[in-house]
Amino acid sequence: MSSYQVLARKWRPHDFESIVGQDHVVTALTRALTEGRLHHAYLFTGTRGVGKTTTCVNLAAALKYLGKRVLLCDFDPQANATSGMGVDKSVSNGVYDVLINGVETRKAIVTTPYGDVLPSSKALAGGGVEMIEMADRQFLLRSALDAVREDYDYIFVDCPPSLELLTLNALCAADSLLVPLQGEYYALEGLSDLMNTVRIVRRNMNPRLQIEGVLLTMFDGRTNLAIQVAQEVKRFFPGKVYATVIPRNIRLSEAPSHGKPITAYDRGCRGAEAYLALANEFLKKNT
């Protein structure tokens, strides 16, 4: 483990100012208000285990299947979205090299049958620490994606679930958030924290950031609990909850180990049908 990775594990910010730094707030506000935002950039956020990466991978692949130009930026050091799209985690260049080492974004993008990927790696775990002394550190990802935004209809960013500099970069790069929520009671507990984070970032960094949609995952409509959770989420996010729900499906769980999205692994299964339905609903909302 590198010294940067050790530092990254020890350094855990607890508030907005410790991530951004007071001296960056005015600059951030000015840039956010005077410059255009990255069009068609969607950030997938949420706690681990709710289907965040699964949804990022499979919605991107489903849109590619439907003929759209899609880039998936894996901004999580675990790099599960990278491997889920069939890209080796040990690829020579990735998003870390773009942000820290100055590699051109296009040179780091990997083309796959399921969509283009800006891959992640374990090196990104220390990236947040390395960014601390860099100018405009919260805008590094946005600048990297700006270089290729005209090449794609949609850019998806899979980010870490914790509040840290990597996540802040993703929030500054995105127009919208897509929030997967598991159809279980405890999934409701983080909603207030999520909305508070969005309000802070919108107020200080990215005034156009919005909740694009909320997706219920691992959903079992046969249980009263799942139905109650769905009702509560719809009350919390009126008009934002997708009609499509993602069911529990063993084939969805198997697909990542084969390095394939579900539409390539088993297009006839319930999971693939659900993500294709989600892709069509997504397009209706965003075209």
What are these regions, as identified by a protein language model?
Residues 52-287:
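P-loop NTP-binding core
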Residues 1-50:
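P-loop/Walker A NTP-binding region and its immediately flanking N-terminal helices
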